[in-house]
Amino acid sequence: MKKKFRTKLKKLQYFKLTFLPGFCTKLLKKELVPIKKGKTSSFRIQLLEKQKLKYNYRLKENQIKKYFKYIKLLKIFNLIQIIELRLDATIFRLGFAKSINQARQLITHGFIFINSILVKKPSFILTEKDLIYINPKKFTIILICRINLFFRYYNKYNLYIYTLCVEYLKFKLQKEFYFKLYLFIPFDENLIKYYYKF
């Protein structure tokens, strides 16, 4: 476990970031010596941007390509907005899970319901007014989610969201409210487009 955690910190070091919210729950210490590499080519910069996105959201290559095709068809959303509408990303953003990995585990183990239907697919794309809630019979999972919500919102004095989510562990997805939860992640979508030649 310790070795796995160290490799995560090394990846952050490689990306020249101190934090990737969906990938690692710890901050990289600033005093660590950066990894020395050769000259940076344009391809390498594009590759790094793609890798940041891939590791943060736990995506595969074919999934990223598929989302770019959605952008061409819909002509509305950008890449990050489509990925943020995935069920695993939404569970993480709401604070029910500490990381994307934990959110994926909650979904695949059958603890998440959408509009009274059990969903076990982390890549499920949500729409406006979808009702998301935790299985009320799973008391240990409810306790874990409440603890996660406490550390996400209550300590930051965002009591409105905390009381909204924690009482019944339900959340109705609304466009205006949803994007207020969006946390800044340093992705350059244009560089990722150039990498995939879209």
From Swiss-Prot:
Keywords for the protein's UniProt record, in alphabetical order: Apicoplast, Plastid, Ribonucleoprotein, Ribosomal protein, RNA-binding, rRNA-binding
GO MF annotations, alphabetized: rRNA binding; structural constituent of ribosome
SUPFAM superfamilies for the chain: Alpha-L RNA-binding motif
Residue ranges occupied by any S4 RNA-binding domain in the UniProt entry: 85-145
InterPro entries in the record: Ribosomal_uS4 (IPR022801), Ribosomal_uS4_CS (IPR018079), S4_RNA-bd (IPR002942), S4_RNA-bd_sf (IPR036986)
Subcellular location: Plastid, Apicoplast
PROSITE patterns: RIBOSOMAL_S4, S4
A cellular-component GO term for this protein: small ribosomal subunit
One of the protein's GO biological processes: ribosomal small subunit biogenesis
Domain of life: Eukaryota
Its job: One of the primary rRNA binding proteins, it binds directly to 16S rRNA where it nucleates assembly of the body of the 30S subunit.
Quaternary structure note: Part of the 30S ribosomal subunit.
Record-stated family: Belongs to the universal ribosomal protein uS4 family.
Protein name (record): Small ribosomal subunit protein uS4c
Organism: Toxoplasma gondii
Lineage: Eukaryota, Sar, Alveolata, Apicomplexa, Conoidasida
